């Protein structure tokens, strides 16, 4: 908390909506920072999930609306003299919201993250996190009406990232290239390297590897 007092938040893009920050350390402790009416608000984030508006406290309260959800498959039951059975596995999550609004994304992230199995290695955990994050890709155009032509990608998912705090490695993929890349922070001499902006994609194109069958 003492270090946060030295941070200055500067708006860069006037199109930016309300911003929410999630900060974590290698022990797993997380806090959320939201600025409301110019005032910083800090919350302990024991769930480890964060999306956009409304505020974090609202999202945590909204979780109670989905108390009926659980991982696994619903057991068969009878309705009068009719036997009812699940159509498929995972029906315990029947009713989980699937739209792209922040409240729905928060619910999906909360249940997917808490139901995922513990992995033995860091890279396995990173790969699993990307599988979860695949559920939150927003395609270009979905925020526009049918009469509008998208001229930009303000709300589409431009990149997805996962961070290994223990080994200090940042993994990411982009909307142009779904291959996972990484930045090893330990390999960077922050005392010597100059401040710079590096594009996430040197070439905005998805590489496709041909499979040959002889």
Listing of model-derived features with the role each one plays in the protein:
Residues 6-8, 12-17, 26-28, 48-214:
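C-terminus-biased signal that marks the final domain/tail of proteins
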Residues 23-27, 34-37:
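Short, structured patches in soluble enzyme cores that scaffold and shape functional sites
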């Amino acid at each position: 908390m003492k270090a946060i007092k030295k941070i200055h938040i500067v708006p860069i893009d006037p199109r930016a909506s309300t911003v929410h920050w999630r900060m974590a350390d290698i022990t797993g402790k997380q806090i959320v920072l939201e600025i409301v009416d110019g005032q910083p608000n800090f919350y302990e984030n024991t769930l480890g999930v964060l999306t956009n508006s409304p505020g974090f406290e609202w999202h945590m309260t909204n979780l109670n609306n989905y108390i009926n959800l659980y991982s696994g498959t619903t057991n068969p039951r009878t309705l009068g003299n009719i036997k009812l059975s699940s159509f498929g596995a995972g029906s315990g999550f029947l009713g989980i919201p699937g739209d792209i609004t922040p409240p729905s994304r928060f619910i999906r992230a909360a249940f997917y993250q808490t139901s995922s199995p513990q992995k033995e290695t860091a890279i396995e955990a990173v790969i699993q996190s990307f599988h979860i994050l695949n559920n939150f890709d927003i395609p270009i155009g979905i925020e526009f009406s049918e009469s509008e032509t998208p001229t930009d990608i303000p709300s589409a998912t431009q990149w997805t990232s996962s961070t290994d705090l223990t080994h200090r490695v940042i993994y990411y993929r982009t909307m142009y290239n779904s291959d996972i890349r990484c930045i090893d922070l330990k390999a960077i001499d922050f005392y010597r390297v100059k401040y710079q902006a590096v594009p996430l994609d040197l070439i905005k194109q998805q590489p496709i590897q041909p499979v040959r069958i002889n």
